[in-house]
């Protein structure tokens, strides 16, 4: 069964296949199911880009979308996530997309349910589709991963984006560097080296900025937030020292003038909104992978 839970479960070949499908979709290919197929979006945390790009992807593939609201469901009566997914499975849903505040919520589910789970983000753990859309954006820009230098900058400890990207990009041959306030370093990470931001600015090909996650921080970190932009953000002055041909990325939502100067969000180097566009194509590709009998085999029509 084609769950997509973490980047560690994907081989280089599987990553390449997903990116190839995503590139095909980006270049105008269409794949639509010819039979009614239900998928459910279960978002237990707020989301704009991930939720709506999944929904756009699902509808472009001809899937019937069930949007789940925890506040209006039996979760409020104590129903477990397992029972919720089994209920959806029982009534004919063929895949579920889940975002949940619990790290690795899927460990207790993956061997117990009979439909694919696509992880749309688990706590501070993993965000595989964000990673895949980032990989697609980098590949479109440079045509390769091998030998690239990538700086992942900011709130590394709380970031599922940092974890997924560092692991996948290392596997694909890139060199990863981190720059972070001391309080937000992830000392357990084995996928990169910490260096001062100002040393990295002129060296790296990709400056990947991370959102300061206010909702995951303790109160004692408030003072750091006030001076974050000047000490740890991409200021206009730092952008001027960036390597020729290098790009700016951010998973969004962007805290303007915190992680990045507002005037840089849509500057020539920025690929922030391109990442969002690529999110639809990547999520179409992972849905195709999860539902091969519906979207990858005899029961689909391919329009070029």
From Swiss-Prot:
Pfam families: OTCace (PF00185), OTCace_N (PF02729)
Molecular functions (GO terms): amino acid binding; aspartate carbamoyltransferase activity
Keyword Transferase found: yes
Pathway per the UniProt entry: Pyrimidine metabolism; UMP biosynthesis via de novo pathway; (S)-dihydroorotate from bicarbonate: step 2/3
Keyword Nucleus: no
Keyword annotations of the record: Pyrimidine biosynthesis, Transferase
Catalytic activity: carbamoyl phosphate + L-aspartate = N-carbamoyl-L-aspartate + phosphate + H(+)
GO biological process: 'de novo' pyrimidine nucleobase biosynthetic process; 'de novo' UMP biosynthetic process; amino acid metabolic process
GO cellular component, one term: cytosol
Residues that hold carbamoyl phosphate according to the record: 49-50, 99, 127, 130, 252-253
Membership in a protein family: Belongs to the aspartate/ornithine carbamoyltransferase superfamily. ATCase family.
Described purpose of this protein according to its UniProt entry: Catalyzes the condensation of carbamoyl phosphate and aspartate to form carbamoyl aspartate and inorganic phosphate, the committed step in the de novo pyrimidine nucleotide biosynthesis pathway.
Protein name per UniProt: Aspartate carbamoyltransferase catalytic subunit
Organism field: Bacillus cereus (strain G9842)
């Amino acid at each position: 069964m084609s769950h997509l839970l973490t980047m560690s479960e994907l081989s280089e070949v599987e990553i390449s296949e997903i990116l190839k499908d995503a590139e095909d979709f980006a270049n105008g290919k269409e794949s639509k199911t010819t039979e009614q197929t239900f998928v459910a979006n279960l978002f237990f945390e707020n989301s704009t880009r991930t939720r709506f790009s999944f929904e756009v992807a699902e509808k472009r593939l001809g899937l019937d979308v069930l949007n789940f609201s925890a506040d209006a469901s039996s979760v409020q009566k104590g129903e477990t996530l397992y029972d919720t997914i089994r209920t959806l499975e029982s009534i004919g849903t063929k895949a579920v997309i889940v975002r949940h505040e619990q790290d690795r919520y899927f460990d207790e589910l993956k061997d117990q349910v009979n439909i694919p789970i696509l992880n749309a983000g688990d706590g501070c753990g993993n965000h595989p589709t964000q990673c895949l859309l980032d990989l697609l954006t980098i590949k479109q820009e440079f045509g390769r991963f091998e030998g690239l230098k990538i700086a992942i900058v900011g709130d590394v400890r709380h970031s599922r984006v940092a974890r997924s990207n560092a692991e996948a990009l290392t596997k694909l041959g890139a060199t990863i560097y981190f720059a972070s306030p001391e309080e937000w370093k992830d000392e357990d990470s084995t996928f990169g080296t910490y260096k001062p931001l100002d040393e990295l600015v002129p060296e790296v090909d990709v400056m990947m900025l991370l959102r300061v996650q206010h909702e995951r921080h303790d109160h004692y970190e408030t003072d750091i937030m006030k001076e974050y932009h000047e000490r740890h953000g991409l200021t206009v002055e730092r952008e001027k020292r960036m390597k020729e041909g290098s790009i700016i990325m951010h998973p969004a939502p962007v805290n303007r003038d915190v992680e990045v100067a507002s005037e840089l969000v849509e500057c020539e180097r920025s690929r922030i909104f391109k990442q969002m566009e690529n999110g639809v194509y990547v999520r179409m590709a992972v849905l195709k992978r999860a539902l091969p009998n519906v979207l990858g085999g005899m029961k689909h029509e391919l329009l070029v």
